[in-house]
């Protein structure tokens, strides 16, 4: 009997509960339906008066679950009156599923945007704010304006966070009952709030309830890489160019586990490793330097050992240069426009404007392009240092309640449950799906595959049937576009290079005779409607200064024409979706297919594959090749073979599992940092709230004095202690009043002196000096100074700690070679480093409290003069990028000129604990 994995068991349990959940949702829909006629009879004023009534009832103790039927009936009627749209029963079910904190899987075209209004209205009654999370600014603005008509009719306020919003605008939008925005904007505002220097700078007001649209894209695909706010780092750029040049002369061997299974294969691999400089795995997207490569680099760089501590940073440059060489291809992973390397989102094909890979990877790609010289003007830009970071998993887990909507969630149900404790509820479609999904056609060569694709497109185009062709990269979309031009077939191309026309192209993709070649359609956000999208087409036809009357007239005319064309296209078979190869994820394939057959319309789909496709090359294409050879299949004849289909499904399953493991790894490591971040951010909020820090600063003094003393007196007899050096350190910390002689006299001489005597005497002295400081400045002035000091020191030390943790994370994988578990080592060392950081915060805070003047400044260039929100970059995930994170520009309100360097008072002699630890 086969043993089931945890994911399979979890999946079975969840599927077993689906029927029970759906029956509950159907009962709720029936309750709402029973109220429909009663609510239809209400006047506008009576309907609008229900919102304050519901709010009062909830404040009096009635639960949201109890209010649900009436609130849903209210929103349904409001939507009918303001939007001309009535929620279907399945939409009521979807809304209830969201309210109960689930992922609602609803097919494309089922009206997910309208579904969201139900739980949003209900949960907004608490007054705590509801966040609607979308994949881009366009959808956030569109949905806030569109659905906002119903919310405002019922007396709720609606805000939208845009990438260019100022802090003041953001604060106003978050104060609304309902706030729309992208996942990155919500996440970055959380991080920026935890870099604020006063409560007036805070923009968010908590994390009560969030509904995530396109939940699989945001919660799954983007979860492998964290959000990061970074600032300039002191990193010399010459090494990027040097290593880009060096790796061009190095030979790599392609290594994949399944290629080296037998003993003979392993012997061959061992030999290959002696004749090559490095190895790389395109499936795992990893690189590893080999002995021969180490010797070559040491010779070229003129160093004895690449692995000496002073050369550690060179290993990072080497790894990035090799990754740039082997794993990042122009016009697939990135494009070069006007001398700038721009990342292409793997799943949507969009250019991620202003975004950059982090940790030196982007610079390595720039150096590669500059070295190859194929693109003029590419230069290596400066690297950035992490100032604040959080993964999307941990950000969304901040919410008291979380829900999501998507058309494709069941394939990731186990991950949603394991990472977010969210169940996936498949909501039935309002009309049955009648799209026909034809079997894959598999060819031996890419040439034969493209010939078949062109023939299929030409035949269907001749009839007028609209065709959507899905490709996996910019490169492939432009290749196919060139072939179509040669055939004389008019078409549109939607990829990263012309994303500005995206909405217009998608709006026309369902029209008669339309041929649209697009990179992955995940998260496009605009339905492909048969006959065209009348709203989008009307918008394109109107001038900017059109009057409302003009808009209504054009919309009416375009709507009637689109309705007639809709029926015509239905007769032709609806939208035909043609996939030019399988994606790494079955979910993305399903999203492409889901563009056809919306709301019961006819449609068809088919994928064309070849043995040269990326997915087939990664996973044992030789098995498929053998099958085709045995069957004597000519190049231009496709096969439909169960074994081949299983091999493709297995390849996708392996990659999905690999990405899942990668996301779990990210979460494991971030959990360590998350515990530390929670403590630091809670401390910041306490300081910002204006809590009296007097007792805390006194504790800082006590701990610092004791640490100084125990470090100096840890060995030897009292006569051997170097008290002169200890007192020198004290004098740099605070104006010492007690002398060594006074102390010795008080105990009868040096031999009788104990550590406890030292601690008690110096602690009493520092408390006395602190009281004098308070009398000199005044209590209020000292409290303000303490608040400024603690915030400044905490922020700077946290930034340094993040740098140290990045450094630790980069090298922790080497612990495998010592037989240690990397995550355990990372947690242990990270705990030690956090302890060292907190000690340093205490030490420096005490020094600043005693050594700064009453204004909190030591002169220009002081550490306290520096504002952490000046000149920052933000870093956000692409949709499932394989390496690193990406950075982008962020502009804030001006807050003074940043200082060149942070200065701390010169406390005890010797290196800081963090630096000592790291170089030990």
Curated annotation (Swiss-Prot):
Q: Name one GO biological process term.
A: protein transport by the Sec complex
List, in alphabetical order, the Gene Ontology terms for molecular function in this entry.
Answer: ATP binding; protein-exporting ATPase activity
> Which keywords, in A-to-Z order, does the entry hold?
ATP-binding, Cell membrane, Cytoplasm, Membrane, Nucleotide-binding, Protein transport, Translocase, Translocation, Transport
Instruction: Give the Pfam families listed for this entry.
Output: P-loop_SecA, SecA_DEAD, SecA_PP_bind, SecA_SW
How the protein sits in the membrane? Peripheral membrane protein
Give the EC number(s) under which this enzyme is classified.
7.4.2.8
Residue spans of biased composition, Basic and acidic residues class? 859-870
Quote the protein name from its UniProt record. Protein translocase subunit SecA 2
Organism, by scientific name, is Streptomyces avermitilis (strain ATCC 31267 / DSM 46492 / JCM 5070 / NBRC 14893 / NCIMB 12804 / NRRL 8165 / MA-4680)
């Amino acid at each position: 009997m086969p043993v089931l994995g945890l994911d399979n068991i979890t999946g079975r349990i969840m599927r077993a509960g689906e029927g029970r959940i759906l029956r509950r949702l159907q009962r709720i829909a029936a309750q709402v339906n029973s109220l429909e006629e009663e609510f239809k009879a209400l006047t506008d004023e009576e309907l609008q008066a229900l919102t304050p009534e519901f709010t009062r009832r909830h404040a009096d103790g009635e639960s949201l679950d109890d209010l649900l039927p009436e609130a849903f009936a209210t929103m349904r009627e409001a939507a009918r009156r303001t939007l001309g749209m009535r929620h279907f029963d399945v939409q009521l079910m979807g809304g209830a599923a969201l309210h109960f904190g689930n992922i609602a899987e609803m097919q494309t075209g089922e009206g997910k945007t309208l579904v969201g209004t139900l739980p949003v209205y209900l949960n907004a009654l608490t007054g705590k704010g509801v966040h609607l999370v979308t994949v881009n600014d366009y959808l956030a603005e569109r949905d806030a304006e569109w659905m906002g008509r119903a919310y405002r009719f019922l007396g709720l306020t609606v805000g939208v966070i845009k990438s260019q919003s100022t802090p003041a605008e953001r604060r106003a939008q978050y104060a609304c009952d309902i706030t729309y925005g992208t996942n990155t904007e919500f996440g970055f505002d959380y991080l920026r709030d935890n870099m604020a220097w006063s409560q007036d700078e805070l923009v968010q007001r908590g994390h009560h309830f969030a509904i995530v649209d396109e939940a699989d894209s945001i919660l799954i695909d983007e979860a492998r890489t964290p959000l990061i706010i970074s600032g300039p780092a002191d990193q010399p750029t010459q090494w990027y160019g040097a290593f880009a040049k060096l790796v061009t002369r190095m030979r790599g061997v392609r290594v994949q586990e399944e290629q080296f299974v037998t003993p003979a294969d392993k012997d061959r691999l061992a030999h290959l490793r002696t004749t090559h400089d490095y190895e790389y795995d395109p499936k795992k997207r990893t690189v590893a330097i080999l002995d021969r490569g180490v010797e070559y680099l040491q010779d070229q760089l003129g160093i004895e050992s690449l692995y000496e501590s002073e050369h550690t940073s060179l290993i990072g440059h080497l790894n990035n240069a090799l990754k740039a060489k082997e794993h990042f291809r122009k016009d697939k992973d990135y494009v070069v426009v006007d001398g700038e390397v721009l990342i292409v989102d793997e799943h949507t094909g969009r250019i991620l404007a202003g975004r950059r890979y982090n940790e030196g990877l982007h610079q390595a790609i720039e150096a590669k392009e500059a070295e190859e010289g194929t693109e003029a003007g590419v230069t290596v830009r400066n690297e950035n240092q992490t100032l604040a970071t959080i993964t999307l998993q941990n950000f969304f887990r901040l919410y008291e309640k979380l829900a999501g909507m998507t058309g494709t969630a069941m394939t990731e149900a186990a991950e949603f449950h394991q990472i977010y404790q969210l169940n996936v509820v498949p909501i039935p479609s309002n009309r049955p799906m009648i799209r026909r999904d034809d079997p894959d056609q598999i060819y031996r060569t890419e040439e034969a595959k493209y010939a078949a694709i062109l023939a299929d497109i030409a035949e269907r185009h001749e009839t007028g049937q609209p065709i959507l062709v899905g490709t996996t990269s910019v490169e492939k979309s432009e290749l196919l576009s060139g072939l179509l031009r040669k055939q004389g077939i008019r078409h549109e191309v939607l990829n990263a290079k012309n994303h500005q026309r995206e909405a217009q192209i998608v709006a026309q993709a369902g029209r008669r005779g339309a041929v649209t070649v697009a990179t992955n359609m995940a998260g496009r956000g605009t339905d492909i409607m048969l006959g065209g999208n009348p709203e989008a087409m009307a918008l394109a036809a109107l001038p900017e200064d059109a009057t409302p009357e003009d808009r209504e007239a054009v919309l009416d005319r375009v709507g009637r024409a689109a309705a007639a064309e809709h029926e015509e296209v239905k007769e032709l078979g609806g939208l035909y979706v043609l996939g030019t190869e399988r994606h790494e994820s079955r979910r993305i394939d399903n999203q492409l297919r889901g563009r056809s057959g919306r709301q019961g319309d006819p449609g068809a789909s088919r994928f064309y594959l070849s043995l040269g496709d990326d997915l087939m090359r990664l996973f044992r294409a030789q098995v498929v090749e053998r099958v085709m050879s045995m069957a004597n299949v000519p190049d231009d004849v496709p096969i439909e073979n169960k074994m081949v289909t299983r091999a493709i499904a297995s390849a996708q399953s392996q990659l999905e599992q690999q990405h899942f493991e990668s996301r779990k790894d990210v979460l494991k490591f971030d959990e360590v940092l998350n515990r530390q971040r929670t403590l630091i951010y809670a401390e910041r909020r306490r300081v910002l709230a204006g809590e009296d820090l007097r007792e805390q600063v006194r504790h800082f003094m006590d701990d610092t004095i004791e640490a100084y003393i125990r470090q100096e007196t840890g060995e030897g007899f009292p006569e051997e202690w170097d008290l002169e050096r200890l007192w020198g350190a004290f004098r740099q910390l605070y104006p010492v009043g007690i002398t060594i002689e006074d102390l010795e006299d008080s105990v009868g001489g040096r031999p009788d002196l104990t550590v406890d005597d030292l601690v008690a005497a110096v602690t009493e002295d520092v408390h006395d000096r602190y009281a004098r400081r308070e009398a000199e400045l005044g209590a209020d002035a000292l409290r303000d100074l303490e608040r400024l000091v603690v915030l400044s020191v905490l922020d700077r030390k946290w930034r340094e700690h993040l740098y140290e943790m990045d450094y630790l994370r980069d090298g922790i994988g080497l612990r495998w070679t010592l037989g240690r578990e990397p995550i355990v080592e990372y947690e242990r060392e990270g705990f030690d480093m956090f302890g060292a950081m907190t000690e340093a915060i205490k030490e420096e805070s005490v020094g600043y409290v005693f050594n700064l003047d009453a204004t909190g400044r030591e002169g220009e260039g002081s550490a306290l003069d520096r504002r952490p929100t000046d000149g920052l970059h933000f870093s956000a995930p692409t949709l499932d990028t394989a390496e690193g994170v990406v950075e982008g520009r962020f502009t804030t309100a001006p807050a003074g000129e940043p200082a060149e360097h942070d200065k701390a008072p010169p406390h005890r002699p010797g290196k800081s604990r963090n630096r000592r630890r790291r170089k030990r």
